[in-house]
Amino acid sequence: MARRIRKVLKTTLLVVGEGAAEKAFIEHMKGIYAAGVFDQKVSVDAADGGSPSAMIRYIARIIGHVSYDRTVLLLDTDIPNTTRDRKAAKKQKLELIEATPWCLEGMLLEVLGQPTPATTKACKNALHAQLSGPETSKQSCKRCMSETWKSSIR
């Protein structure tokens, strides 16, 4: 009789970004931290913007069809979350990560030790100028995120 090979089940994680730039950043971070290190399958998606409630509804549709152990939403804070949004996220067992100030780009500028402009658009322009390509490509993040920055995040 042949031996059965036991399949190790991995926990699953869905990380959803507000838009294409957030998705590219999350995929870049996934490549650094999740590559064979964790016993976890990480899926990345983009909610394609909108209000926080629209993004929460988008994720609710996804997890209605596919079950994940953990679900995380990375969203900008330029449009504030309401109590209703937070309750809906809690009901879906959705963890919210709010990028402050204003957006992911502002948060990254702050982490890089650079001055943070006063508006979302200015933050995006300041960071996108430092990228090696379009902000929607995970390869573009490598130029401005040095080893020093990566080690400070760990």
Per-region residue spans from a language model:
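Short, surface-exposed binding/anchoring microloops in extracellular/periplasmic proteins
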Residues: 15
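C-terminal accessory helical subdomains adjacent to catalytic cores in phosphodiester-
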Residues: 2-12, 23-46, 53, 57-154
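Helix N-cap/beta->alpha junction signal
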Residues: 18-19
